Amino acid sequence: MKNKEKDMKWTTLDSEYLFRRPWLTARKDRVRLPNGHVIEEYYVLEYPDWINVIAITPDDKFVFVRQYRYALGKTVNEIVAGVCEEGEDPLETAKRELMEETGYGGGEWTKTATLSPNASAMSNLTHCYIARGVELTGGRSLDEGEDLEVC
């Protein structure tokens, strides 16, 4: 049996960074497919890995955050999510983000999946967790740009 990953791998012929920012980097690549076809402009968005957490209290209530999302132009309810710091274990990121955004901690944690948010254009992964039995254990510690409510 052939190694399908090797057969399907694209070759990068050239790569140019269009811009680099702390939360987003855009790159334009020139690539060759295994069949020889060359794509002159293939755009890639480089992001750090993310986490998201479905948090459930001992009395089976879900912990959400509510905040305004500029890109959507509206206020929405969300599960806890955040960016993995460089070198940080995704589970530790998830626990840190849950505590920082909601004040909830503890519980039993299970990793449910590692997914690509958009494999055709984004370089990062999303690490998904369920935290059962979380309790309000500490104070929140929001980043300067965060204004959210726990619901």
Tell me the role of every PLM-derived stretch.
Residues 2, 7-9, 42-47, 52-96, ...:
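Conserved Nudix-box catalytic region and its N-terminal flanking loop in Nudix hydrolases
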Residues 1-21:
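Extreme N-terminal tail/first-helix region
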Residues 11, 105-112:
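A short coil-to-beta-strand element that immediately follows conserved catalytic motifs
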Residues 88-93, 101-108:
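Beta-rich strand-turn-strand
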Residues 15-18, 113-118:
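Short, solvent-exposed loop/turn elements at beta->coil junctions and helix N-caps
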Residues 27-35, 118-138, 151:
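Active-site-adjacent beta-strand/loop module that shapes the phosphate/pyrophosphate-binding cleft
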Residues 14-52, 58:
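Acidic, metal-coordinating catalytic segment for phosphate/diphosphate chemistry
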